[in-house]
Amino acid sequence: MSQFFEAATPVAIPTNNTNGGSSDAGSAATGGAPVVGTTAQPTINHRLLLSLKEAAKIIGTKGSTISRIRAANAVKIGISEKVPGCSDRILSCAGNVINVANAIGDIVDVLNKRNPENEDAAEGEAEEHYYFHFLNHILPAPSKDEIRDLQQLEDIGYVRLIVANSHISSIIGKAGATIKSLINKHGVKIVASKDFLPASDERIIEIQGFPGSITNVLIEISEIILSDVDVRFSTERSYFPHLKKSSGEPTSPSTSSNTRIELKIPELYVGAIIGRGMNRIKNLKTFTKTNIVVERKDDDDKDENFRKFIITSKFPKNVKLAESMLLKNLNTEIEKRENYKRKLEAAEGDATVVTERSDSASFLEEKEEPQENHDNKEEQS
């Protein structure tokens, strides 16, 4: 029996409506604006692999499309710079889990839209074969037998989600149980690439389906990643678009010509610097275009109160930028904790003063009462 694609309305957090209007909303997949979550939610940073044409389509005229998606979903979206000679770019989308999933659903909707003035060009674009094989879809195009409503066939889109290899096994699950459950539950197709992206420890998870269904499955994938505690972050390398060497080997971010800086961060602040799900350190690596390795602690490590952060890049200015931002994050975290400590001490001090004043007042009342009795006795005499 063929797998049927299922259209779905993205899950959304209801917002506090302060304008007196209706709080109901859909998503781009259902014709409305996605509901943006305002309550505290776990945050995630997803990265998508895009072709140059896809990146241009998402950016839009003078950045109008990407700005609209960013504002509508309250997320941070950025696309890597265009590298001469490279056919791919990376889109990063960071925010709370549901908002990020909604934003990516909107991105799928944008990529699905055809130019009605040039249908031939649109068909040619869909069938384009890329030299960089990771841009070529792993999954076959959907057939008429796999959809209930033929008019919705063009609404089915793709996402190339970049995922660290350490998370792939959790998404697939034991004997493929988790990925099968996601496929059956949300009416989508999902497959993981066998090959690693060049000079990285990351692979592609390709998702095919309606924008709303992709949104919902991304929420569950995000939860799997965030709850995955067995993360070997110290050795993982993130993919970034780059040219290959003349020998055919990809340029590695850890070559001998790289600039390298080592920083020792107090163990107490390592978790805050890395961030939940490694979001903070990943954002720093993406923004500065550097590779940052956090060394594991050894049992015989003499500096047990510190952890070593190693920053490398072929551009010295990028390393310096990453170093300054890392130290700034550290100083901000130290200052935040010091301020919190001072507030606690001040609150405890205020409570002590109030108690002392209360005791003093009680003591004075006890002293004054005998004096009043003595005065009364004098008046009577």
UniProtKB/Swiss-Prot annotation:
Entries under Gene3D superfamilies matching the protein: K Homology domain, type 1
Entry keyword set: Chromatin regulator, Chromosome, Cytoplasm, mRNA transport, Nucleus, Phosphoprotein, Repeat, RNA-binding, Telomere, Translation regulation, Transport
Pfam families associated with the record: KH_1
GO molecular-function term, one example from the UniProt record: mRNA binding
Any one GO biological process: intracellular mRNA localization
Chain intervals with Basic and acidic residues compositional bias: 370-381
Major localization listed first in the record, in broad terms: cytoplasm
Database matches in InterPro entries: KH_dom, KH_dom_type_1, KH_dom_type_1_sf
Domain KH: 43-107, 156-221, 258-326
Post-translational modification: Phosphorylated by the plasma membrane-anchored casein kinase YCK1. Phosphorylation at its C-terminus reduces its RNA-binding capacity.
Residues the record lists as Phosphoserine modifications: S358, S360, S362
Bias (Low complexity): 15-33
Protein location: Cytoplasm; Cytoplasm, P-body; Nucleus; Chromosome, Telomere
Region (Disordered): 1-34, 344-381
One GO cellular component term: P-body
Quaternary state and interactors: Binds RNA.
More details: Present with 15600 molecules/cell in log phase SD medium.
Function: RNA-binding protein involved in the correct localization of transcripts in the cell. RNA localization is a widespread mechanism for achieving localized protein synthesis. Required for the asymmetric localization to the daughter cell nucleus of the ASH1 transcript, coding for a specific repressor of transcription. Overexpression inhibits translation of the ASH1 transcript. Involved in the stability of transcripts such as the MTL1 mRNA. Involved in structural and functional organization of telomeric chromatin and regulates silencing at the HMR locus.
Family (UniProt): Belongs to the HEK2 family.
Protein name listed in UniProt: Heterogeneous nuclear rnp K-like protein 2
Encoding gene per record: HEK2
